[in-house]
Amino acid sequence: RGQRNLLGAEKSATNADWYCEQRQTYQLPDEPNMFFGVPINTREVFGVLHIKGFIFDDTVLYSGASINNVYLQQQDKYRYDRYQKIHNAALADSMVNFINDYLLDFSAVHPLDVANRPRTKEIRSAIKAYRKNLSAHAEYQLESAVGFSDVLTISPLFGLGASGNELNQVIEDLFLQVQEKLVICTPYFNFPRTLRSKLARLLEQGKRVEIIVGDKVANDFYIPPEQPFKMAGALPYLYESNLRRFCEKFDAYIKNGHLTVRLWKDGDNTYHLKGVWVDNQYILLTGNNLNPRAWRLDAENGLLIHDPKQELLSQAEKELSHIRQHTKVLQDYSELEELTQYPEPVQKLLKKFARIKADKLVKMIL
């Protein structure tokens, strides 16, 4: 990703070019390199590095955000995300060790802040071996969950691929732990089948589910109808179609108050929140979008907080009240637009996708 432009954007200098330029501008020595490209697959569409976290000595700043102008609102718009600051030496060490022990395998991982970067085809076999090794062996090395009191703990988790994925398994287990209420944040409404079935079971059992998702105009791929259309601009409508079908299917639970669906929208700002809250007992911090791509293709991580004595309850409630601030609760699935109400170029593309069965493929990889 560091070697390409934004999806749908004009070709221009990439992040990797900028890293190289900065090294020259400041006349830095050739060693050590500071920026590395981690290839999770030989093609970006089939997997990228999506793990999160910044480590400063013994402090971990965990966020789904990137460090750039829009997330940090350096100009007019902002992209809304979560930021958690955790001071713990053991946790910080485990995250740094993970990078050194597993990510920085120099057979496949190369510096980006140099002019001569290897082409994918030159390291294709190394990339395949690298992904296989990460999927089979990579994990955060801790003897036990990191303790903050006699019971409050945090466990770092990693996952890659459809089988043997620890993070996926923990997320599925969290859904099974719900006694009263599950809260989910995701920017892209596109749950994998296993989570859809678990949500259905929770509702059938009389449990409460709250889903906080971005309105289509709060999606980072959204293009206003008055602007020239690009293919990536159809994605927010595809996600809204998913949401409409889901809400129609579970309309009775929306009506009886067991299912709450909130749409986040604040002007032309965008929404990028992910996370899971279970019964004031568990909080999952993650960059995982809870979609098929995260489930099968990308390298993902997360921090699972277990808080059986509700020591973090006031902080968790405060964060959720902030998240809900710019949301509207759906009363009926018909409040969401349907295909015939979409701009003509979007209608044409989504109809074409459906006709050639490409919509299912798109949902698997985006």
Explain the meaning of each model-derived region.
Residues R1-V178, V217-D279, W295:
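HKD-type phospholipase D/PLD-like phosphodiesterase module
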Residues A252-L366:
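Long, C-terminal catalytic modules of enzymes
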Residues R1, V170-Q177, T194-V209:
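Catalytic-core regions built around general acid/base machinery
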Residues D76, Y188-T194:
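Acidic-and-aromatic substrate-binding clefts and catalytic sites of carbohydrate-active enzymes
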Residues F56, S63, C185-P187, I212-G214, ...:
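Generic beta-strand/beta-sheet core signal
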Residues F189-F191, K216-N219, N291:
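Short, catalytically relevant binding-site loops at active-site mouths
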Residues L199-A200, P236-S241, T286:
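A post-motif C-terminal structural segment
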